[in-house]
Every structure is written in C-alpha cells, then in structure tokens.
Amino acid sequence: MQAIKCVVVGDGAVGKTCLLISYTTNAFPGEYIPTVFDNYSANVMVDGRPINLGLWDTAGQEDYDRLRPLSYPQTDVFLVCFALNNPASFENVRAKWYPEVSHHCPNTPIILVGTKADLREDRDTVERLRERRLQPVSQTQGYVMAKEIKAVKYLECSALTQRGLKQVFDEAIRAVLTPPQRAKKSKCTVL
C-alpha cells in the first residue's frame, strides 16, 4: 500500500483543522480551538488503488513560523488553504504560504483550497464584508491564484456541509499518483 504525506497550511482560523476533522470523522467540530488535530492516518481507495493517507495539520499563527517547517520534510502534497470569507487569508497565499512551501519543498505539488464555501452566499457574512468594503473571494479569483502559484488544482469545499470535501483529498492523492506532465524543454547539446 502506497503511503502519501499530505500537509495542510494556511492562515489561522481558515478552517484547516475543521477540514481534517470533518473529513476523518464525518462530523463538524463545534467551536474554534487553535490546532489540536494530531497527525492522522487513513486507509482510502482512490481510483481503485489502496492508499495510506497521512494528514498533517499545522498552526497558521505567526508564533509557529519557525516550528511549522519541521513538518515539511518528505511531504508528497500540500493543501494551501484560505477562507472564501476572508480576503486577507487569500492574499496571504501569495504573500506567505506559497513562498514558504515552495522554499522548503520546491517540487512538491500544491492543491489550492478555498474553505468555508457555505459562507460565500451567507447573508450575514456578505454584509459584514460589505461594511468593510470587501466581498467573498470569487471562484475566478481562486483559479487565477492557482495558476499564479502553479497549483495542480483549485478546489472549494465546506467542512460544515461536506460539499467538495472528499474531492479535495482525492485530488491531493491523484496529484501524487499521477503528477502533471511537465513541458519537455529542448536540451542544448554542444558537440
């Protein structure tokens, strides 16, 4: 059985731990508790292949900036997360998370994940953002960011409703099992 290490990164409170708890237990945790999810191992089938999926949660808060990279060695795939209702967390994908993971693991595939998809249409959420002259991150913005950071895929999900949740992890596994073909560069040969 092939083992795959999947590390989840992103700003504090974007829903990384909820994503993992909801996926692994099929239940949404009640209140926000900064990262307490232990590394978790799940045996799953993707495209008829048995996979041992190791899930590593990380703390997004700045206090952990020096500690977090200790979980990066031997990572097979990163989930870089932001909350669709938090434009600042989206900007930090470009400003912080992509630079950090690409520095430590330059050839490791990235899946860009927009969390809290259920809040994009939530009236209270939209109103709170509007009061600050902001709006939820659009799907188009997500696709543009994914291209910019060379992510294998851009996906949106809700840990609360579980919409798109399984797909996030299935696509993370596929990114490792069937890496995208790199464009072949012609090599210069001097004779």
Swiss-Prot record:
Subcellular location: Cell membrane
Motif, Effector region: chain positions: 32-40
Main location: membrane
Organism: Caenorhabditis elegans
Gene ablation phenotype (knockout): In the second generation, there is defective mitotic spindle orientation in the EMS and ABar blastomeres which results in disrupted left-right asymmetry and failure to undergo morphogenesis. Due to defective apoptotic cell clearance, embryos accumulate apoptotic cell corpses. Distal tip cell migratory defects. Double knockout with unc-5 RNAi suppresses the distal tip cell migratory defect in the ced-10 single mutant.
Subunit structure: Interacts (GTP-bound form) with pak-1. May interact (GTP-bound form) with mig-10 (via Ras-associating and PH domains). Interacts (GTP-bound form) with chdp-1 (via CH domain); the interaction facilitates the localization of ced-10 to the cell cortex.
Lipidation (S-geranylgeranyl cysteine): C188
Annotated GO CC locations: cell projection; cytoplasmic side of plasma membrane; cytoplasmic vesicle; cytoskeleton; cytosol; membrane; neuronal cell body; plasma membrane
Residues that coordinate or bind GTP: 10-17, 57-61, 115-118
Substitution effect: G12V: May be constitutively active. Formation of ectopic processes often branched in PDE neurons
GO biological process per UniProt: actin filament organization; apoptotic process; axon extension involved in axon guidance; axon regeneration; body morphogenesis; cell chemotaxis; cell migration; cell projection assembly
Expressed in which tissues: Colocalizes with pak-1 to hypodermal cell boundaries during embryo elongation throughout the second phase of embryogenesis.
Family: Belongs to the small GTPase superfamily. Rho family.
Protein's name according to its UniProt entry: Ras-related protein ced-10
Keyword set, alphabetical order: Apoptosis, Cell membrane, Developmental protein, GTP-binding, Lipoprotein, Membrane, Methylation, Neurogenesis, Nucleotide-binding, Phagocytosis, Prenylation
Residues with Cysteine methyl ester modification: C188
Matching PROSITE patterns: RHO
Signal peptide: none
UniProt membrane topology term: Lipid-anchor
NCBIfam families with a match to the protein in the record: small_GTP
